[in-house]
A protein has these predicted regions:
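Short loop->beta transition adjacent to catalytic acidic/histidine clusters or analogous donor-positioning motifs
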Residues: 8-11, 32-43, 51, 63-67
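Glycine-rich, basic loop-to-helix element that forms the pyrophosphate-binding segment
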Residues: 70-87, 97
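Short, well-formed alpha-helical segments that are part of the catalytic scaffolds
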Residues: 19-33
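Donor-binding/catalytic cores of nucleotide-activated saccharide
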Residues: 76, 97-209, 214-230
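Membrane-interface aromatic/basic loop that binds lipid-linked glycans or pyrophosphate carriers
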Residues: 276-356
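A conserved acidic beta->alpha catalytic loop
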Residues: 45-54, 73
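Catalytic core of nucleotide-sugar-dependent glycosyltransferases
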Residues: 211-220, 225-254, 259, 270, ...
């Protein structure tokens, strides 16, 4: 395919917006300045109380490819769904309104690799922006060459490295999403993790770019970093949605047992950490939330299956093997207070930052 033919492929960029006046200019400028010009940029405003709509309207008046629409106020997942239904592009890119693209050629690189490999999803590396410092995240090269059906690919892709979990930093083939009717579920947060797991279960073909294609601004006010009392319910809702999706697509549930187990371990750890921070480092608060996970029938089944598993975990990192086995055993035997102490130690040593 020639360069001209590739430029004929349209990319739809979908951006949910809520109170993003501080960063939205930088976000839009990084997209407008892309060397790849066949774009439509759809911004869905979710009832911003600041000047975000005014700023976007000025861009909209200047750039015909920019379109702002009114959202339902139900969160980023619903906004992305609205954008997906309006999108006319051959490919989809999601971005958050407080992040930006550091490479003006990243869309060209996405398209080139997608067309060369016939990939459904092209994944780039990313970096975090934290207190004015760029911190490169763990790169996906450690699992990119693994078979997508392997435990290593799933574990690193969605958890220890985590690159596959996020909606951003990727190029999606719209036809793939449309054919499989993949949309964002109605969740309080982590809807992008479920979205990408649904893509994975539908046997998406992946291609990986070594380039850093996205800068994620770590924002303590983001939903992802805030304490939520409904968090346990949200994670179990995600798991139930995932199990329903596996059944809907006529997949063997046994193939995804470890995926669900890992998901619940990471969810329980994350919620334990948030309870610890929210309640002045109270071990009893952590114990209480771990008990919620261990008492849920689906959680108990998942932790017990991982703890009783005879086959060795097909994960290369020994530390992760030890942590997964220890956590699942602790949850199986209801050692909630002991597990709470373990979470305290990991948070104190800042190991938790690698799990976020």
């Amino acid at each position: 395919m020639t360069a001209l033919e590739k430029q004929q492929k349209k990319i739809s960029v979908i951006i949910p917006v809520y109170n993003a006046e501080k960063y939205i200019r930088e976000t839009l400028d990084s997209i407008i300045k892309q060397s790849y010009k066949n774009l439509e940029i759809i911004l869905i405003d979710n009832g911003s109380k600041d000047r975000s709509p005014d700023i976007i309207q000025k861009y909209e008046a200047k750039y015909p490819e920019i379109h702002m629409i009114e959202g339902s106020g139900k969160g980023p997942g619903a906004s992305r769904n609205r954008g997906l239904k309006l999108a006319k592009g051959d490919y989809i890119v999601f971005a958050d309104a407080d992040d930006y693209l550091p490479d003006k050629d990243i869309f060209c690189k996405y398209i080139n690799l997608a067309e060369q490999t016939d990939a459904d999803i092209v994944v780039s590396n990313y970096a975090r922006l934290w207190k004015d410092k760029i911190l490169p995240a763990t790169k996906h090269q450690s699992f990119a060459l693994c078979s997508p059906s392997s435990e290593e690919f799933r574990f690193q892709g969605f958890f220890s490295v985590g690159t596959l979990s996020y909606a951003w930093g990727k190029l999606y083939r719209r036809e793939f999403l449309r054919n499989h009717q993949i949309y964002f579920a109605d969740l309080s947060y982590a809807e992008d993790k479920l979205f990408n797991m649904q893509c994975y279960i539908c046997d998406a073909k992946y291609a990986f770019l070594e380039d850093i294609g996205y800068i994620y601004r770590k924002n303590d006010m983001s939903v992802s970093w805030q304490y939520r009392p409904d968090s346990v319910e949200n994670w179990f809702k995600l798991v139930y949605e995932l199990k329903s999706w596996i059944e809907k697509k006529d997949k063997d549930p046994k193939e995804y047992t470890s995926l669900i187990g890992y998901l619940l371990i990471f969810a329980a750890f994350f919620d334990g950490k948030m309870e610890y921070m929210q309640h002045k480092k109270s071990l009893w608060a952590v114990r209480k939330v771990l008990k919620k996970y261990g008492s849920n029938p689906m959680g108990r089944k998942a932790f017990t299956e991982l703890a009783d598993r005879r086959k060795k975990l097909q994960i290369t990192q020994k530390l992760w093997k030890i942590m997964i086995r220890t956590f699942s055993l602790g949850m199986k035997w209801r050692w909630y207070l002991l597990m709470s102490v373990g979470i305290k130690i990991l948070v104190s040593c800042r190991v938790d930052e690698r799990l976020s």
